[in-house]
Structures are given as C-alpha cells and as structure tokens.
C-alpha cells in the first residue's frame, strides 16, 4: 500500500489558482498535494539577441526553491553565484515543455519568462511547475490579446506533466516525497493535450526496469495528464 493510501492510478489533490500576482501578466499557484509552486509570467517587449530580426518570440523559464520549502532550510542558490545543475536542468525542462506547444512567430519579437518558485516541496515539483506554468502562460497571452499586442493565441495545445514510478514493485502515479525517496524507479512524463510526448525522464534507482514496465508507467502518465489537462481547462474556463 502507498504511504498516502492512494490507489496506484490516483493523483494527489490538484488545484490551479489563477491571478495570484497583482503585477505579473499571468500567474498561477499550483498545488499537487503538499507540493505548492508559484508560477508567474513576465512579458518583455524584446526577443533574445539571437532571435532579433527573425520575427519570432521566445518562452523561457527560471526555477527556484524557497529556503524553507523543504523539511530543513536550504541555502539560497544566489549565495553560490550560479544555479545548481539540478536547477538548470529543471528550468530548461520547463522552457522546452512550454515552447513545444507555443507558436513562437505568433508572439512577435518578444520574450516571456516563467518564474517557478517552489513554496513547499513534497515530491513532483518540476511536474507541478510545468502544469501551473502553462496556466500562467495562457493568461499572459490572454492579457496580450486584450491589449491588442497580439492578434491570435500563440498556444497550440495544452501541456502537463506528472511523475510515475515503481514503488515496491508496483507502478504508481504522482509520487510524493515518501514514495519518491523509496521508489525503485522514478520517471517524469511531459505530454500535450493531444497526447504527444514532449519529454520522458526515467531512472532506475535499484534494479533496472523493463520495457513492459516503462509502457505501464507511460499508460499511467497518459491517464494522469489527461486529468491534469481537464483541470487546466476547468481553471481557464
């Protein structure tokens, strides 16, 4: 049995609260159980240097954890002068995931930065961040359209993410920290609303996993992201 008493294919309670920032062009406070991430979208009226003159825009992301997002205080990364390898990996993942469903030329030569700040971490921070970041980006584009900055919605599809893993030999969906720290296999799946695969990250912590187990995890992830996309649609309705 899972520590949370959830069924193998059961998500944690998920909430997507919009417009939580007074100043950001788009914002969302996303909760996956006890994991909470604040996602804000900020518009800049210029593209990165390598895109100037191309007619295309850019969506990028930054990710950070507040010092007391974890059981014990962690030092702010600003003190070390640069983000850790883990932080860089996660923020690139978030950016890639959002760009996969964005029509960049429809943005014009502008950049949107999505800041994902983990308020409380209990496993699955990157997957929660991607799911909430999409809502913040959606609202940023809506803000731009109401002000005639752009004429069409650059978003081509939804994108959401969820973790899956093998816990005591059983494929399970949406691992919390207790499960993640004891799982034999941990994987993250990023999928679009139409079911396209944006990214799969999977690691065997103990024994290697089989192709059949990977497909089982993918099946769980598909069902989970379908529910997350439904929640996104409900949130923006």
Swiss-Prot record:
The keyword Cell membrane is assigned to this record: no
Alphabetized UniProt keyword annotations: Nucleotidyltransferase, RNA-binding, rRNA processing, Transferase, tRNA processing, tRNA-binding
InterPro entries from the UniProt entry: ExoRNase_PH_dom1 (IPR001247), ExoRNase_PH_dom2 (IPR015847), ExoRNase_PH_dom2_sf (IPR036345), PNPase/RNase_PH_dom_sf (IPR027408), Ribosomal_Su5_D2-typ_SF (IPR020568), RNase_PH (IPR050080), RNase_PH_bac-type (IPR002381), RNase_PH_CS (IPR018336)
CDD domains: RNase_PH_bact
Keyword tRNA processing: yes
Domain of life according to the entry: Bacteria
Catalytic activity: tRNA(n+1) + phosphate = tRNA(n) + a ribonucleoside 5'-diphosphate
EC number: 2.7.7.56
Record: residues binding phosphate: 86, 124-126
One Gene Ontology term of the molecular function aspect: tRNA nucleotidyltransferase activity
BP GO terms, sorted: rRNA catabolic process; rRNA processing; tRNA processing
Role according to the record: Phosphorolytic 3'-5' exoribonuclease that plays an important role in tRNA 3'-end maturation. Removes nucleotide residues following the 3'-CCA terminus of tRNAs; can also add nucleotides to the ends of RNA molecules by using nucleoside diphosphates as substrates, but this may not be physiologically important. Probably plays a role in initiation of 16S rRNA degradation (leading to ribosome degradation) during starvation.
Family: Belongs to the RNase PH family.
Name the UniProt record assigns to this protein: Ribonuclease PH
């Amino acid at each position: 049995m899972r520590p949370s008493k959830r069924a193998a294919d059961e998500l944690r309670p998920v909430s997507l609260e919009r417009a939580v920032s007074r100043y950001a062009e788009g914002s969302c406070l996303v909760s996956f159980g006890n994991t909470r991430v604040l996602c804000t979208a900020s518009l800049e009226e210029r593209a990165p240097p390598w895109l100037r003159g191309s007619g295309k825009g850019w969506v990028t992301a930054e990710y950070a954890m507040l010092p007391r997002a974890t059981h014990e205080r962690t030092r702010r990364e600003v003190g070390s002068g640069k983000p850790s390898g883990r932080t860089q990996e996660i923020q690139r993942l978030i950016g890639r995931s959002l760009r996969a469903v964005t029509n960049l030329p429809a943005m014009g030569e502008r950049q949107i930065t999505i800041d994902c700040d983990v308020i409380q971490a209990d496993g699955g921070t990157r997957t929660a961040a991607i799911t909430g970041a999409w809502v913040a980006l959606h609202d940023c584009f809506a803000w731009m359209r109401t002000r005639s900055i752009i004429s069409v919605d650059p978003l081509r599809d939804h994108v959401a993410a969820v973790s899956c893993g093998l816990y005591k030999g059983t494929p399970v969906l949406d691992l919390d920290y207790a499960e993640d720290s004891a799982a034999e296999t941990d994987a993250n799946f990023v999928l679009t609303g139409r079911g396209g695969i944006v990214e799969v990250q999977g690691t065997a912590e103990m024994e290697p996993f089989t192709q059949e187990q990977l497909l089982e995890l993918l099946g769980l992830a598909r069902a989970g992201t379908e529910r997350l996309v439904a929640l996104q649609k409900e949130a923006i309705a």
